[in-house]
Amino acid sequence: MDYLSESLKLHYELRGKLEIQPRAGVSNKDELSLAYTPGVAAACLEIKDDVSKSYDLTRRWNTVAVVTDGTAVLGLGDIGPEAGMPVMEGKCVLFKAFGGVDAIPLCVRSKDVDDIVNTCLLYTSDAADDK
């Protein structure tokens, strides 16, 4: 099999290897009111009172970011963050398929280590935990 050409066809066909799937139903008014407003306010207020509950009340407990600045992508060298996205998506697929972990690709357009670290901290809401 010609993996390069077949993979390129797959990428054109799928237009990305990831998608978000809802875990909560929204097929009627009651389900929608539980998953979103007004019911969601209860979870928000619980987390407001105790931030650690975000791990119990959201998918945060099982979600990671796969981060790159695009400078060292699978031996391709410095190809940039946009060109690194297919590899990051592939890694996210592996996290889910083999570990059951939800992974989100985060391709940062900066080569400055402090920028990248700060972006990750801000994205994950852990910046306050480190102060």
Where are these regions (language model features)?
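Gly-rich Lys/Arg/Thr-decorated short loops/hinges at beta-loop-alpha junctions or inter-strand turns
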Residues: 28, 68-78, 95-105
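Single conserved hydrophobic/aromatic residue that forms the stacking wall/gate
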Residues: 123-131
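An N-cap/entry alpha-helix motif that binds or orients negatively charged groups
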Residues: 15-56
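Solvent-exposed alpha-helices and their adjacent loops that cap or buttress functional pockets
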Residues: 55-60, 96-97, 122
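Extended, charged alpha/beta regions that create polyanion-binding interfaces
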Residues: 2, 13, 22, 91-101, ...
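Glycine- and acidic-residue-enriched helix-capping/strand-helix junction motifs
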Residues: 74-88
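Short beta->alpha junction loops
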Residues: 106-113
